[in-house]
């Protein structure tokens, strides 16, 4: 979600949109209720003594989840803890704030490592809307949009039903008095439209939430909080898979952390880069391995149609052939090494009135499509279109450079045209990789 959202933010901003980044940190749903209750009941967990170590909290969360699934009394206490949190219980709030602080530090370290644009100022979690949730629910009830059902307040839909045709509601207030995610999502829509003035809202969230967002958007439109002039879209994404075709996990069944995936990619990139450039100084090798490894993971995510699942194959990700970030980084470095050999004052535009070699024409036509591709990415929220374009550009440039002499061109006009194509290709590759959030170091 962070990698895809980061690329969309960059592309939209590049095209002139006023983009507001919002990161949904500060969640306090059932998961936080489970964890808070578990920590209160497990004083020996030692998470505070571990200086807020996120791995310690992850272990506690796994234990809380396991207990929640088998201990009904604990599950009930955890649910009541969520209600206490939403009601402003001081002790629960204090623990929650500590947990959020630990999470934010861990996330920010990953964001910085990934080179995404999110900062602590972009955090906009559920807690920020707690004070208006009752008002949101009351407004839905008063408008006849939400009704009470089995003690909960729900919104029903004529076109949404379960496998047995039973109605599937959107629960805005649970039977225990707590507010569900739907109430928060509705409050955020109202705020983003009425206060932030949004004309397009993109939710980069797991594909499994498709039905939830369909119902939330429909409810917001019925309530008048999401007028027709405003687009709200769920931008779903698939799952990273292991070699067995299942969601990527460690041997003991735990989900693999993003940090662990990045470590593996950087280590493998170091081997590949070091093998190709054995004379690189240690500091340069570390710098390039970081750029290549992180870029490889980001590009693998972005180059796949975002709704598809894809395997985490670090060897393929850092391959120097095929549609990989490393291939494009090396293509970009190669183009810039050529540019450094061009004389000063080289033309930057192509004179289409001169005869063009087929490889020149193909490259020029492809370069001309860059703006249209960016517009497609912005409209569809599909970064893989840009990846495909850049991969094709790199291949076309390879064909061009292999068949068309630049410095030894037959005429001055031909030499100027080919130099301009080199410069335009370099600028486009650098810009495109930058919009994907992939570093383009040169030399490599």
Task: Pin down the residues of each PLM region.
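Non-catalytic interaction-recognition regions
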Residues: 1-444
């Amino acid at each position: 979600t962070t990698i895809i959202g980061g690329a969309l933010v960059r592309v939209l901003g590049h095209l002139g949109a006023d983009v507001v980044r919002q990161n949904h940190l500060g969640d306090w749903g059932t998961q936080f209720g489970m964890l808070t209750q578990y920590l209160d009941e497990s004083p020996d967990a030692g998470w505070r003594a571990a200086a807020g170590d996120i791995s310690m909290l992850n272990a506690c969360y796994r234990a809380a989840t396991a207990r929640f699934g088998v201990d009904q009394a604990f599950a009930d206490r955890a649910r009541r803890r969520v209600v206490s949190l939403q009601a402003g219980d001081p002790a629960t709030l204090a623990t929650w704030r500590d947990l959020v602080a630990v999470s934010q530090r861990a996330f920010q370290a990953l964001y910085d490592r990934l080179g995404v644009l999110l900062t602590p100022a972009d955090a906009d979690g559920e807690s920020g809307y707690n004070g208006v949730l009752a008002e949101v629910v009351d407004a839905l009830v008063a408008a006849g949009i939400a009704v009470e059902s089995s003690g909960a307040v729900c919104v029903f839909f004529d076109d949404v039903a379960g496998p047995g045709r039973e109605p599937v509601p959107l629960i805005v207030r649970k039977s225990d008095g707590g507010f569900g995610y739907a109430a928060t999502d509705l409050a955020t829509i109202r705020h983003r439209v009425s206060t932030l003035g949004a004309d397009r809202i993109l939710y980069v969230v797991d594909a499994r939430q498709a039905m939830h967002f369909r119902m939330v958007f429909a409810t917001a439109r019925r309530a008048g909080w999401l007028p027709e002039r405003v687009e709200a879209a769920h931008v779903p994404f698939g799952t990273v898979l292991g070699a067995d075709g299942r969601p990527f996990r460690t041997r003991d069944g735990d989900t693999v952390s993003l940090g662990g995936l990045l470590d593996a990619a950087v280590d493998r990139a170091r081997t590949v880069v070091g093998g190709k450039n054995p004379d690189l100084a240690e500091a340069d090798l570390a710098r390039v391995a970081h750029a290549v490894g992180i870029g490889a993971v980001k590009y693998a995510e972005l180059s796949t149609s975002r709704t598809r699942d894809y395997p985490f194959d670090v060897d393929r990700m850092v391959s120097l052939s095929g549609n990989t970030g490393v291939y494009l980084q090396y293509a970009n470095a190669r183009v810039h090494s050529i540019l450094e050999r061009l004389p000063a004052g080289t033309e930057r535009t192509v004179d289409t009135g001169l005869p063009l070699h087929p490889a020149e024409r193909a490259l020029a036509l492809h370069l001309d499509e860059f703006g249209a591709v960016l517009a497609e990415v912005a409209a569809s929220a599909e970064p893989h279109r840009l990846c495909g374009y850049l991969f094709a550009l790199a291949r076309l440039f390879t064909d061009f450079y292999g068949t068309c002499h630049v410095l030894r061109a037959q005429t001055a006009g031909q030499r100027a045209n080919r130099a301009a194509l080199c410069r335009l290709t370099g600028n486009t590759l650098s810009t495109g990789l930058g919009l994907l959030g992939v570093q383009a170091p040169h030399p490599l």
